[in-house]
């Protein structure tokens, strides 16, 4: 076994080699692990936003309801494009889903070409925060309208509709839950980016 001590030419005694001199340089394994985790989170983000988008645009439901001035019930459809808040929500899901796909491909490419990581990571971190703001605001806005659809508002004469359009409301609730999960993933990505910048 190789000795970790150097003999002193004056005293003839061995002196211990500093620990820093025997410690191997940090490997790239930890860096690759971080990039792999980043890719996994972005894949989850894409899956969540795409699923939320599909569920939202397929939430249409038609039921026969009694309309004022009409003697017999008439078929009335409930669609996401009936509400500007839901339209904004769908647009936000489209944008975020597309961004998640593109950023996943970029993150995978950084595994193959790590020399571009520092510069590209700055752009990804900034865009992550932008997407976080867009998706969070859209989710909150759509959630407010969904709550009125569920509970109604007697003070302003807004009736609840979820007792009639149950499938429509279930789909919206599922889409909102997936969007909230995607928002949390974007928050995790933003926090990880901030912590990685502070790490020496």
Swiss-Prot record:
It holds the Pfam family CASP_dom. The chain crosses the membrane at residues 37-57, 86-106, 130-150, 172-192. Residues 58-85, 151-171 are extracellular. Residues 1-26 are annotated as: Disordered. It comes from the Eukaryota. One of its GO terms (cellular component) is plasma membrane. It is found in: Cell membrane. Residues 1-36, 107-129, 193-200 are cytoplasmic. It is a multi-pass membrane protein. The keyword Phosphoprotein does not apply. Keywords: Cell membrane, Membrane, Transmembrane, Transmembrane helix. Homodimer and heterodimers. Belongs to the Casparian strip membrane proteins (CASP) family. This is CASP-like protein 1D2.
